[in-house]
Amino acid sequence: MSDWGFEKTLGVVTALPNVALTAPRNVGLAHATLAPKMTLLDRFRGKGGRRLCVEALAAQRLVSGNRELAEDLADRAEVLAVSAGQTLISQGAEDNDIYFILAGTFDVVVSGRRVAGRSAGDHVGEMAAVQPAQKRSATVTALEDAIVAKLSAEVFSNLGSRHPQLYRLIAQELARRVLQLESRSIE
């Protein structure tokens, strides 16, 4: 904005909620237009948002490029914004949703000790989704503003019936994480 040299005018205009001033470089204020301010969440909603959501879900380890599964997930998931510092999952909690991380990064903490980081392409909450009697084994907190696709355990189970490879991929991911934790404990 400072490239345009009229910060004070922009400050007044952008005081409107969810509105941004857009104009090409070297164009006077008379040619600037008001446009809705795009949020990270907006990228995954509305026009073009579903396509981007499907692409992000297809890139998930659990989806492994399966376009049909990615579309099923996009149809059934609730896409949510998570603010930096917000806790997504609390250790010991009894909820059992699974979250696919579409954007952003998270810390995974067990009993006050950071054990892992998770980012776009990863998922969290699968243990409680697969075993509903299982309480949450970790606290997952956003390190930056993030976007997740949330599925209830029931919906995830139904998708697992239609796409049985999900359970094989979860088993592979859990095995990878166990090996990762074991290698850290040896160091």
Task: Describe every region a protein language model picked out.
Residues M1-E187:
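Cytosolic regulatory regions built on CNB/CRP/Popeye-like sensor folds
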